[in-house]
C-alpha cells in the first residue's frame, strides 16, 4: 500500500494517530487541574511506567488539554546532567511574562519575575548551568538566599499568587523525573507542599520510570501523601486493536481479526511496538485488508527496526560489564529476577555486582520492584539481549 498515507508513527514521543486506552487518566488530570485552579485540595500526578508505554505522548496531550482550558504550563524534560533550577528558570520566565499581560495579575507576575532574577543570581554559583534573561532587578529578600529549597518555595509561592490573581493555574509538566537529583526533588516537593498548604494554584504533572516512586519517597518521606502515582502499563487488548483499526479505517483500509490478534500477541500492547507493527504491516500489505500473513511478514522488519533504534540506542550506552549483567538477566527470562540469581549466572558474588547494578539503575535500564529484585525498564529487552549477544561467551 501507499507508504505516503501510512498513518502509523513509531518514534520517541511521537503522537500516535489514535491515543487509545488513556481517556480515563486524561480525565483524572483534567479534573485535578480544574480543582487546583479553583483553589480546592488537589494532589499532583506522577505517571510511572516502563519505556515505550507512551508516557511522554500522554504528558504532552495532557498539556495540550490544559492550555486549551486556559491554564498556564511549563514543559520540561529532565535529561541526565542538567540541574532542575536550570531547567525551570527559562520556562518559568516565559510563563510569568504571559501572566504579566493579564491586567489583574500584572503586578504580582512582575514581582515573581523579580524573584526569578534573585533566584537565578543567588544559585548561579552552585548551579552553573542556570541561564535566564532578567526582565527586572531582583527584589532583596525574595527567593535570593542561595538555598534551593527555601528559594524555590518562595518563587513558586510568588508565581502561584500571580496565577491565582489571573483566575488560572500554573502546571509544571516534567518528563523523565527519575533523572532529577534527590536534593533537587526534595526542594520541588517542599515548594509544591507549601503551595498546596496555601491553596495556591501550582501543581506538578510528571512522568518517569518505575523507580521514581521510591526516589520521591527518599527525597521527602511525606511525598506519597502529596502525589498520586498512576501506573502506565501496556494497552488492553481492545485498546491495542483500536490503536490499529481506527487509523487504518480513516485511510479506508481494513485489518482482519486474525491480523489484529497477531499484532496484540507480538506487541504485548506496548504502544511504541503497536505503532512499529502497524507501520510495517501497512508497508508489507499490497492492498486492503491487512491480513495475518502480512503481519507475520512484517514482524521481521518490525523487530529489525526496534533492534536498530529503540533497543540499540540504549544498548550502546552500556559498558561491557553492564552488558554482561543485562545478558545474564536475559538468560533468566523477562524478570523480575533476584540479585542472587543474576550473580550466580555470572559466577560472581552479589556484593561485587552492586556498583554495576547501581549504575544500570542510574542509567534507567533496570529498576527494583522489591528489595533484592531487579527488572528491565525496557519491555522485551531480554529477547533483544539474546539476539544481540547470542551464545554463551558473555558468561565466560
Predicted regions located by residue number:
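Conserved Walker B catalytic segment
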Residues: 139-210, 217-218
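C-terminal leucine-rich, beta-strand-based interaction scaffolds used for sensing/assembly
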Residues: 5, 43, 258, 297, ...
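Short regulatory helix/loop adjacent to the ATP-binding pocket of P-loop NTPases
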Residues: 211-227
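Walker A/P-loop nucleotide-binding motif
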Residues: 41-61, 346
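Amphipathic alpha-helical "lid/sensor" segments that cap RecA-like P-loop NTPase cores
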Residues: 240-309
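Conserved catalytic segments around the Walker B and adjacent sensor/switch elements
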Residues: 63-82
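Conserved P-loop NTPase mechanochemical-coupling segment
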Residues: 107-152, 158-165
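A short, basic N-terminal segment
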Residues: 1-45, 92, 105-108, 394-396
